[in-house]
C-alpha cells in the first residue's frame, strides 16, 4: 500500500511538472523569466489543483527538474528577444548590452566613454547614485562587467530582470476606490490606482497581474481584499518592454514610493540578488517603509528569491484552501509569513473574478494586514507594528517559526474562495 501511494505521488508530481512546462511555454514572454504556476486564468480542476502536498514532501529529483525548467525558460526568453535580453554571468536574464555602475565618478564615466561605452542615464535614488552604460556592440555582459570593473568601478552588475507570477491578455478592470491607507504595488500597472507612475517603456498601463495583486489588497467587485478601502499606489515596472521588471526600474519605483510617503510596499516579483536594489531597499527601510515580497514559485531547489531574501524584507509564501504550503513555493534566506495563495479568486482583465495561484497572490494579503496597523511610515514604530502582526498569525506546521510557514499564517479569512 505504501509503495503504491509513493508511486502515485511520484506520478502526480511528474504530471504537475508537465503542466508547468506547458504553461511556461504558453505564458507571455516576460512572465516566463522564472516560470510560475498559472495566475490568470488558472486551469480549473486540472493537475495543478490536485497537487496539495507540503513543500517538505517535494523530492530532490522533482525539485531539480523544477530548477531545470526555470533555466530552460530563461534560455527561451533570451532566444525570443536577443536584442533586449541576455543572460548575466550567473545565468539570470538581464537587459542585453547594458551594465549598471553604482556611485560612478566623472573620471570613470569618461574612461568608459573612451572605450566605446555610451552613457544611457545617470540617476540618484534615495541618495544612491548609479549609471546605466551601453556596451560596445559585440561585448557580452560578462566581458563588459569585467572591463568596467578594471576601470575602477566599486560595483558593476547587469540590470537583472524580475518575474511576475503570470498574466493573461486583456484590459484590466479597476480596483475599488478607497480613502484608507496608501499601499504600494510594484508590478505591472493597476487600473483604478489612486497614484500611478511608470518606470518602463509604455508605462504606466494596466496589467492583469498588477491589478490582481491590487484587488487582493483593496478589493474589486466580488473579490474582497485584505484591507477594503485601501488606496493603491501603483508603480508599473513592465509597461510594454520585454526587458521590463529590471533592477533599476524597481529601484526607481521604490524611491517614488518613499517620496509619496507609502508605508507598506508589496513586490510580487522574483529575481537574483542585486547590489543596487539591496542598497535602495535598505535606504527605504531606514525611512520607515515596510517592504513585503513573495518567495516565488520555482520550488525549493531554485536559488533564493529576491527581493524577499534581502535583510529586513518581509518574505511571504502561500497556502492552499486547506492551509497547506504550496508545493511549488520557492525559498528565501528567511521566511516571515504565509497567506492564502491558491483556491481563490482575484480580479482579472475581463472585469470578472478568476482563479489565481502562487505566492505572488499571498504577499498582498500580508501587505494589507501590515498597512492596517502601520498606515504611515515611521521608523520608530515599525517594529511594534510587526509585533502586532505576529500576534495575529496562526502558528502552522512545526511549533514556532519554521521553513514552510514562517511565523504563521495571516489573513486566512481574506480569501475569496473559488467555487
Model features per residue range: what roles?
Residues 24-29:
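N-terminal signal peptide c-region/cleavage motif recognized by signal peptidases
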Residues 181, 185-187, 305-375, 379, ...:
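Extracellular S/T/G-rich loop segment that most often corresponds to the catalytic His/Ser-adjacent loop
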Residues 153-155, 179-182, 228-232, 260-265, ...:
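Loop/turn elements at helix/coil->beta-strand transitions in domains of secreted/extracellular proteins
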Residues 33-36, 238-310, 324-325, 350-363, ...:
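Substrate-binding/access-modulating region of protease and related hydrolase catalytic domains
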Residues 202-214, 298, 354-366:
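Gly/Ser-rich catalytic serine loop of serine hydrolases
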Residues 19, 34-37, 41-44, 84-89, ...:
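C-terminal subdomain of the subtilisin-like protease fold in secreted/lumenal serine endopeptidases
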Residues 2, 36, 41-50, 54-55, ...:
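Autoinhibitory propeptides
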Residues 173-182, 189-248, 310-311, 330-334, ...:
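Subtilisin-like serine protease catalytic core
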Amino acid at each position: 500500500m505504501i509503495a503504491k501511494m509513493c508511486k502515485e505521488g511520484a506520478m502526480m508530481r511528474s504530471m504537475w511538472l508537465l503542466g508547468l512546462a506547458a504553461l511556461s511555454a504558453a505564458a507571455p514572454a516576460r512572465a516566463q523569466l522564472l516560470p510560475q504556476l498559472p495566475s490568470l486564468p488558472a486551469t480549473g480542476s486540472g493537475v495543478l489543483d490536485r497537487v496539495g502536498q507540503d513543500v517538505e514532501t517535494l523530492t530532490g529529483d522533482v525539485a531539480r527538474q523544477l530548477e531545470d525548467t526555470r533555466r530552460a525558460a530563461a534560455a527561451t526568453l533570451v532566444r525570443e528577444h536577443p536584442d533586449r535580453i541576455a543572460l548575466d554571468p550567473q545565468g539570470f536574464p538581464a537587459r542585453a548590452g547594458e551594465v549598471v555602475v553604482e556611485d560612478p565618478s566623472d573620471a570613470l564615466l569618461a574612461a568608459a566613454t573612451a572605450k566605446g561605452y555610451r552613457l544611457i542615464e545617470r540617476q540618484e535614488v534615495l541618495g544612491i547614485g548609479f549609471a546605466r552604460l551601453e556596451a560596445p556592440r559585440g561585448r557580452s555582459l560578462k566581458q563588459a562587467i569585467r572591463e568596467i570593473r578594471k576601470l575602477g568601478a566599486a560595483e558593476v552588475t547587469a540590470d537583472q530582470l524580475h518575474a511576475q507570477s503570470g498574466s493573461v491578455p486583456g484590459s484590466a478592470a479597476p480596483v475599488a476606490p478607497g480613502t484608507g491607507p496608501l499601499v504600494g504595488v510594484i508590478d505591472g500597472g493597476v487600473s483604478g490606482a489612486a497614484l500611478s507612475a511608470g518606470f518602463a517603456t509604455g508605462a504606466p498601463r494596466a496589467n492583469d497581474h498588477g491589478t490582481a495583486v491590487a484587488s487582493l489588497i483593496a478589493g474589486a467587485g466580488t473579490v474582497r481584499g485584505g484591507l477594503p478601502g485601501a488606496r493603491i499606489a501603483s508603480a508599473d515596472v513592465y509597461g510594454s518592454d520585454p526587458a521590463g521588471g529590471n533592477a533599476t526600474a524597481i529601484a526607481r519605483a521604490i524611491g517614488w514610493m518613499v517620496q509619496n510617503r507609502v508605508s507598506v510596499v508589496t513586490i510580487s516579483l522574483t529575481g537574483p540578488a542585486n547590489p543596487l536594489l539591496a542598497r535602495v531597499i535598505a535606504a527605504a527601510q531606514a525611512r520607515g517603509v515596510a517592504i513585503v515580497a513573495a518567495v516565488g514559485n520555482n520550488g525549493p531547489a531554485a536559488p533564493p528569491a529576491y527581493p524577499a531574501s534581502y535583510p529586513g524584507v518581509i518574505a511571504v509564501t502561500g497556502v492552499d484552501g486547506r492551509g497547506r504550503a504550496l508545493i511549488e513555493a520557492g525559498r528565501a534566506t528567511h521566511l516571515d509569513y504565509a497567506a492564502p495563495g491558491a483556491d481563490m479568486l482575484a480580479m482579472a482583465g475581463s472585469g470578472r473574478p478568476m482563479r489565481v495561484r502562487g505566492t505572488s497572490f499571498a504577499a498582498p494579503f500580508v501587505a494589507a494586514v501590515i498597512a492596517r496597523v502601520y498606515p504611515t511610515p515611521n521608523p520608530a514604530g515599525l517594529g511594534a507594528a510587526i509585533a502586532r502582526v505576529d500576534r495575529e498569525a496562526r502558528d502552522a506546521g512545526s511549533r514556532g517559526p519554521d521553513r514552510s510557514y514562517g511565523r504563521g499564517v495571516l489573513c486566512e479569512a481574506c480569501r475569496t474562495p473559488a467555487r
